[in-house]
Structures are given as C-alpha cells and as structure tokens.
Amino acid sequence: MPDGSNLSAMPSTTYTSSIPNLELASESLWTFLFQTTQHDPSLPAFIEAATGRVLSRADLRKLSLEFAYGIRTRLPQGNRLFRGDTAMIFSPNSLAWPIAIFGLLAGGVRATLANSAYTSAELAFQYTDSRARVVFSHPDLVPVVLSMFKTIGVSEDEARRRLVVLDIYGNGAETARKFGLLELGDLLGHGALPEEEKFTGRQTDETLLLCYSSGTTGKPKGVEVCSIRLAFLPTY
C-alpha cells in the first residue's frame, strides 16, 4: 500500500459506466412532463391515500393551466402573479398541492414551499426573505397566515387580498367564506393558458423553486433551484 506522499505520482484512471449516458432535459419540468414525454393521460398522477381519490395526468395538466391563467386574471389587482414573481405554498400533502405547484410552474412563477408545521413567526421570515407576494394555504393553516401578516404589519384587508385557501375536496369554501378569502375553486374554470411558459437556452437557469433549510443552527437558508435542475430529476 503506497503512502500518501506517492499518491499524486500514481497514474489516473477514468472508469466509464457501461450504462449509456442519459439525454438530459433542457426545458422546464412542466414541459418535460406534459409535452416531451409520452404517457397515457388517463393514468394516475397522484392518489390521495386517505380517500383513494385520483388526479390523472390529464386532470393535472388541465387544472394547472387553468390555475396559471387564474393567478394572472382572478387574483385581486396588484397581487396577480406573472413570470418571475414568487408565491408561497403553505400546506401539508393534498391533491390541491400538485395543482398549485404545477400551476405556478406553468405560469413561470417561483414557488417557495413552507413547512406546514411553522409558527407565524417562522413563516414570516420565509415569506419576507423569499419576497413572496401571495400565500396559498391549507384551510387549517389560514389563522397562522393571518397572524403572520399581522406580525409583519400587513393590514387585515391587504392580508385577505394576498391569501388563497388551497383545498379541492374539503372545507376550503367554508374557510374562505368565514375569513372573506378566495379559494382554489375561484381560480379554476375561467379559462386556461394556451400553453405553459417556456424555458429554453439561458432561460433554463431561471429560478423556479425557493426551498428553505430547517434552520437548526440559525435562520433557515433559502436554496434556489433553477428550471433545468428540476427537469433533470425525473430523467434519473
């Protein structure tokens, strides 16, 4: 066994896998999943374990384009979302969650994903640090979001304009009525983008996800994930 001083003198060897190289996507995740790859649109995209409800690939494609249209046209003036804006999703897993995330991706809007166990103070840091404009919240977490807005000095009226209840089968409508908010259903069924926002060439380096660390040893750290990195993941 050579000692460490001789390692640098040893010839280098490159080992090449026998598995062919993958052709990596050079587009957005939305385009890769719904335009480039070929899958039966009737197949399930997501299944809700607790209820057995299914969201098919066709459903998800249709609803995400409707969502992308809705955030441009149905949100209050001054809070509508366009390419390059940032929105927050504050919700545990549900069938509404993929509609929101893929809807934001289709519209070219950056998504920052908040831990559904956050307190209002923890949520306030991520909301302000990410520069999110609108929060899509699970019905049960609406009080946390409203408390967060109060903490950072946003008026009750403006808070209601920046908050959308994210629910598709549960008590979203009831919560929306109680607090005077829009809900997911208000954004759907009014039209759809004719196509998703495209990310090609240098545009594939644009940020589409802002994920945050747990903040165990200090404030959570934001991590930017660009369009092309998202599209790489399903390739593997």
Question: Which role fits each region the language model picked out?
Answer:
Residues 41-44, 180-182, 188-212, 219:
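Conserved pre-ATP/AMP-binding loop-to-beta segment of ANL
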